Amino acid sequence: MLLWLAAALVDLSALDATVRLDIRYATANNFLGRPVYAQARAFLRPEVAQSLVAAHAAVKTKGFGLLIFDAYRPLSVTRLFWNELPPEKRRFVANPAKGSNHNRGCAVDVSLYDLASGREVAMPSPYDEMSERASANFAGGPALARSLRDLLRSALEASGFRVYRGEWWHFDHHDCPRYSVLDLSFEALDAVSSLR
């Protein structure tokens, strides 16, 4: 059963190579300061990936592209996040007792990049910042940053996603409740894919 569930994840890069990846947990550029993924990959449920590609097409008409920071995340990584953070910061990560929508392959952490320059755009806060500036409705900061955050949100919501209010970058697909939590590495997902 678990293998069948894992086979239901697709590599986002195989669907649209113009969706850019900056998988922060495969680098030291994250709140832990060290890599936790062996590979910089983005896996999602097929329906979720198709919705994300549709949102990417929408922002391309405005001169931007989607920049993916994280997608499917093994449950063991969610446990690691929980255990590494002090209790007062745990509100910024999912409780591993329940699992997260990242663990289901139906959540994505995403920003925008400028198609002309190829650079990531400025948002009201950096990715993974654990502060009020990360809120999807934060009213401070530069107007342009808020405008770009709202463009991202509008495109994702029009494609079937809902923003997580505490993080402007985190979007859950409306189909999340139907998916099970998984705890398979990217390498294990590749092995399952090769059996198809």
PLM features: what roles do these ranges have?
Residues 4-71, 81-166, 174-196:
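Extracytoplasmic cell-surface/polysaccharide-interacting catalytic and binding patches
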